[in-house]
Amino acid sequence: MGAELGIYKSCVSARSTDKEILKHAQDGGIVTSLFGFALDEGIIDGAIVAATKEFAHKHPAKAMMDNSNMEFHEPWRPIPCIVNTKAELLAAAGTKYNISPNVSLIKEATRSFGLDKVGIVGTPCQMQAVRKLQLYPVGARDVGSSIALAVGIFCMENFPYQSILQLVEDHAAMKMESVKKMEIGKGKFWVYGKRGQIVQLPLKVTHKYEQPGCHVCLDYVANLGDISTGSVGSPDGWSTVFVRSKIGDSVWAKAMAAGCFETQPIEKVKPGLELVTKLANEKISKNKKTLEERATFGVGKALRNPYI
């Protein structure tokens, strides 16, 4: 495939062999299983993940927030948290379709939490931030070397919390506290209620709610992760996995040897890499137009002297 999929050593369709993880996971349970294995093997001693109010309430010492206002914290607003056990990973599992500032917890993870080997999961832009922090550790000396495993997730765009609130409560007519799961797939935004109700919204409804910063991003598949993963390209209940770096290759090989995953050749599943490539190119083409438009705004040009 072309440059739109980034550099990778291997690509497969995979899912966790742990049935408990699959009950909690969004798709194939890749991130939860990887971090669980990495914790067990001492590859990492903690991971930064996006959790929710319920997790932070149960594990207040693990959350990056002011716990004095916990009762006012909105349901489904992601909270960056540190996890150190499989039980905590399971409690935090699942995709949250709004912005979670996971990278902002890295420095705190190595200092206040005393972690020497940190795992982090994030969107493509967050993987870029992690690599920049490693290359240019301004104000974060010695932090970059503590990042032991970075797992990226596919992302077309993300949403501010208020946008998700509008989509769920106004368009899907469901209260946020009654939502069990949200997902994007098959051209729809899906909202699943705790009482079994399912609402699907056409993606065209969601576009005006997208985070504006997402419209200048040219990375769909988290090119800079050690491993990147997402549901697109694989059958329901499975995930597409790109193994990208030496670190990622080593961890993935060990996890496979330990029986953590079952895999299928990506060439033998439908819709396969053809759909991943199509969406990656669509994101690049669409957002390049935004970049070209912004180039005409005059940003970066010398300011005219207002007194002349």
Q: Model-found features: residue ranges?
A:
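Iron-sulfur-associated redox domains of electron-transfer enzymes in respiratory
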Residues: M1-I308
